[in-house]
Amino acid sequence: DLYGQLYKLPVCKLFGGSKKKIVTDITISVNDPEVMAEDTKNAVDRGYDTLKVKVGVNPDLDLARLSAVREAAGPDRRIRIDANQAWNPKQAVRLLNQMQEKGLGIELVEQPVPAHDFEGLKFVTERSYVPVLADESVFSPADAVKIMQMGAADLINIKLMKCGGLYNAL
């Protein structure tokens, strides 16, 4: 930040960033499908094009919830799902493939399996049409490297607070 102040540049420019606009999402929390559909309509009315939907609390209901969200969102909105480590690898693949078959248009799934289960994450990544985002699995640069080397995820979410700040994130 001091260099940014010295050179009168935002920190993102100092690190080579060129985007003027970023995509953000709004979280649709787990609830009854009807409530989630209403929350989705409210988010769309507020201008959100990307929705992050919490799933995993009751996998049997996840398809119904996501169907309701997709119907409320329409075909042009992006839907990301966050399972918060709730599924086992086989369950994740089964559910994600069912979502694909139903045409729910899921952009990505965040942390479908427990954080420490890198092999399970890889299992899902190799067998699902839905791209997998590692989140809770990444606590350090070594974790990120291991996940990339293993091919355990398609994407990595780096949280600055979790990994020790901007320097470690880079």
Residue spans of the language-model regions?
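Metal-cofactor-binding active-site regions of metalloenzymes
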Residues: D25
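Catalytic domains of carbohydrate-active enzymes, especially glycoside hydrolases
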Residues: N42-K54
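Metal- or metallocofactor-binding catalytic centers and their adjacent structured scaffolds
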Residues: D1-L6
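Active-site beta->alpha loop and helix N-cap motifs at the rims of alpha/beta catalytic domains
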Residues: I28-A37, N42, P59, L63
